[in-house]
Amino acid sequence: MRIDIMTLFPDTVGDVLSESILGRAQERGILRIETHQIRDYTANRQNQVDDYPYGGGHGAVLQADPLYRCWCHVCDEAGAPVHTIYLSPAGHVFDQSDARRLAKMDNLVFVCGHYEDRKSVV
C-alpha cells in the first residue's frame, strides 16, 4: 500500500508516521508513506498557499492551484488510480468501517489543510 500525504508540515507528519506500527510496516516494505509540501507547488515567490474566502468571512482558506498541482504530481508518481481524502474538522468521523474499506485500497492520498476550509473549486 502507498499513502501520500499533502501537507504544509511534511517533516512533522513524516516523523510521526515513521514510528510504531507504521514505521515497522514501512521497514518491512508493506507500506510506503510519502509526504509532499504543498508550498512547493505555488506560483509565487513567497510560496503563499492561503487566500481569503470568496464573499468574505473569517479566517483563511487554501488556494486551489497549489493543491491541484501537488495532487497531480502525487497521481503521476503513484502511477495508478488514487483515492483522495480531504481531512477536515467539518467532515465525517473516521471509524473502523472506514479503516477496513481503506485498507483494501492500493493508493491513498490524504490532503491535510490545516485551515478552516479550502477553495470550493478544489
Regions found by a protein language model. Name each.
Residues 1-75:
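N-terminal nucleotide/polyanion-binding subdomain common to many enzyme families
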Residues 120-122:
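Conserved small/polar residues in nucleotide/adenosyl-binding loops
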Residues 63-112:
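S-adenosyl-L-methionine/SAH cofactor-binding core of RNA-modifying enzymes
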